[in-house]
């Protein structure tokens, strides 16, 4: 398939970069060679979590009046790239002595090969990495050679990475404050019913459906509200919204989701691109956000939902537990399960959490009665 070919090509590039790195010698940080400040390098225009992560760092440095520049860089295909928040500030110039590179370890070698050794030379290089399991892929370990330090969004990620390096690994959580805009969108804009209690499940196809686990949320919803005609009638004012970002990355995702919701007229499927302002408004427009994820490095959408005042139902495991607990969200119990096969980049034999629907089923009803 096209995806497999692309993965093989990327693996080849990474191997090439590893060979090149062994031949290269990155010049160590030299104080005074460059001005004090930060070069933020990442998918600044990206509509995905990596892009949002880089923009959060830019905003944080802005608010603290720290000198910095912003360089837009992504490893193809990169997904949709429509965010223009920092469009007028993008530059190729890197005048400062610290690089903060928002490229995950999986693509860090490609970034090195693409950007060039001179970007690394004489600077203090920080990789801002997210990862979602408690073990780290062996093939990504060479990426540690390219950094002086690693920052992560959660202790969950930090504790994993510390097993593999003696270099500093520091938790720098996302400072969540969704970009605001004077334009607000109501439910009518999204073709959603204005008179129903709506749950929302949202994920990016590039984030691996088996990890995001939307099928568990759909199953829990159907069990609670669509089990039979009597239940449907009783809860006719309740609905579930499924929003897939970048659905074009996985036609298989669309097909699977479509097959499990086709008999439910109170499940509303949304795909296609949304601007950041639309996403923020959608999070505020619904009544509850649901994430029965198997693992999260941080869980930005959950944090953003809480920020705009929308209650969250979430699996009680991984990065999200560092900013939510049973006092602030509806936490769902889980069993740890072993991956039965590879779900790239997550390898067979690793473990992650599987939300217990036994615990989940009453929760949506509890939410509707307590909202």
List each model region and its residues.
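Short hydrophobic beta-strand element within catalytic cores of glycosyltransferases
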Residues: 311-314, 324, 330-331
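Extended catalytic core of nucleotide-activated donor transferases of GT-like folds
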Residues: 22, 26-29, 39-41, 74-160, ...
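Donor nucleotide-sugar binding/catalytic pocket of nucleotide-sugar-dependent glycosyltransferases
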Residues: 14, 148-159, 166-182
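Aromatic "clamp/platform" in nucleotide-sugar-dependent glycosyltransferases that forms part
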Residues: 294
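Nucleotide-activated donor-binding/catalytic signature segment of Leloir-type glycosyltransferases, i.e.
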Residues: 252-277
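Nucleotide-sugar donor-binding and catalytic loop/hinge architecture
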Residues: 28-35, 183-198, 233-235
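Conserved donor-binding/catalytic core segment of Leloir-type glycosyltransferases
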Residues: 39, 193-212, 218-222
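Conserved small/polar residues in nucleotide/adenosyl-binding loops
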Residues: 2-8, 359-366
């Amino acid at each position: 398939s096209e995806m497999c070919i692309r993965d093989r090509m990327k693996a080849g590039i990474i191997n090439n970069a590893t060979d090149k790195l062994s031949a290269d010698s990155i010049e160590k940080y030299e104080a005074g060679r460059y001005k004090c400040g930060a070069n933020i390098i990442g998918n600044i225009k990206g509509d995905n979590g990596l892009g949002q992560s880089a923009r959060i760092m830019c905003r944080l440095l802005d608010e603290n009046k720290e000198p910095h520049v912003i360089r837009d860089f992504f490893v193809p295909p990169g997904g949709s790239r429509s965010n223009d928040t920092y469009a007028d500030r993008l530059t190729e110039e890197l005048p400062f002595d610290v690089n903060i590179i928002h490229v995950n370890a999986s693509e860090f070698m490609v970034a090195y090969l693409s950007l060039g050794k001179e970007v690394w030379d004489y600077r203090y290089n920080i990789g801002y990495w997210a990862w979602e399991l408690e073990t780290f892929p062996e093939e990504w370990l060479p990426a540690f050679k390219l950094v002086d330090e690693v920052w992560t969004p959660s202790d969950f990620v930090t504790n994993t990475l510390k097993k593999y390096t003696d270099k500093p690994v520091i938790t720098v959580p996302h400072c969540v404050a969704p970009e605001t805009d004077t334009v607000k969108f109501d439910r009518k804009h999204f073709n959603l019913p204005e008179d129903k209690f709506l749950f929302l499940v949202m994920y990016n196809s590039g984030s691996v459906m088996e990890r995001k686990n939307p099928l568990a949320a759909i199953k829990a919803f159907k069990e609670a509200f669509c089990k039979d005609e009597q239940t449907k009638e009783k809860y006719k004012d309740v609905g579930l919204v499924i929003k897939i970002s970048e659905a074009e990355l996985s036609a298989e995702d669309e097909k699977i989701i479509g097959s499990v919701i086709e008999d439910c007229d109170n499940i509303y499927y949304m795909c296609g691109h949304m601007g950041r302002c639309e996403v923020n408004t959608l999070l505020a427009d619904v009544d509850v956000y649901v994430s029965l994820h198997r693992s999260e490095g941080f869980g930005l959408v959950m944090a953003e939902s809480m920020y705009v005042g929308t209650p969250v139902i979430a699996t009680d495991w991984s990065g999200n537990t560092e900013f939510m607990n049973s006092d602030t969200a509806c936490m769902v119990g889980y069993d740890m399960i072993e991956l039965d096969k590879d779900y790239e980049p997550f390898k067979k034999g690793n473990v992650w959490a599987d939300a217990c629907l036994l615990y989940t089923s009453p929760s949506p009803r509890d939410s509707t009665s307590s909202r």
